[in-house]
């Protein structure tokens, strides 16, 4: 089951740690959608036909024309620490984007309408859709490895 929570307001230290509020404030996928517009699905990766249909539907409904595989691994990624720091910088892009985790684990942080950060723990089979113009950031977990499929609108969307 997906884990989503409101982050502490001023996280310090390693971004790859959970950074829960105390006590933790869990959030449901429905609340995530209402607060940030971000959509979440857990895909059945064992049923290849259903998976292909779901991804085809996603690409058609959201006009995703490009996709790639992105791997971030402490053992093979050059300048891993610099890359983690770069990816954890807040960013906002003028187009929606989707990410599906195919190996490893990661955190996606999305800013809600009140300026609070919501953290999504993403693992194998998780698919998230981040709306256009939504502030977000990304990092691995302490396992330091994630492999994902990234879906884009067109060539200029990376």
Curated annotation (Swiss-Prot):
GO CC annotations, alphabetized: cytoplasm; nucleus
Name of this chain's protein: Probable inactive acireductone dioxygenase 2
Source organism (scientific name): Caenorhabditis elegans
Annotated function: Probable inactive acireductone dioxygenase.
Pfam families in the record: ARD (PF03079)
Keywords: Cytoplasm, Nucleus
GO terms (BP aspect): L-methionine salvage from methylthioadenosine; methionine metabolic process
InterPro entries for the chain: ARD (IPR004313), ARD_euk (IPR027496), RmlC-like_jellyroll (IPR014710), RmlC_Cupin_sf (IPR011051)
């Amino acid at each position: 089951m997906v884990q989503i929570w409101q982050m502490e307001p001023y996280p310090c230290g390693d971004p790859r740690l959970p950074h829960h509020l105390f006590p933790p404030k869990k959030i449901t996928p429905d609340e995530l959608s209402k607060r940030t517009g971000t959509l979440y699905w857990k895909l059945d990766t064992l049923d290849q036909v259903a998976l292909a249909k779901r991804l085809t539907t996603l690409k058609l409904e959201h006009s995703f024309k490009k996709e790639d595989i992105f791997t971030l691994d402490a053992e093979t990624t050059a300048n891993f620490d610099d890359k983690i720091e770069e990816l954890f910088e807040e960013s906002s892009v003028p187009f929606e984007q989707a990410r599906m985790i195919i190996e490893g684990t990661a955190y996606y942080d999305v800013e809600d309408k009140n300026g609070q950060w919501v953290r999504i723990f993403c693992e194998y089979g998780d698919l998230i859709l981040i709306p256009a113009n939504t502030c977000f950031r990304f990092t691995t977990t302490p396992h330091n490895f994630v492999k994902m499929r990234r879906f884009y609108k067109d060539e200029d969307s990376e």
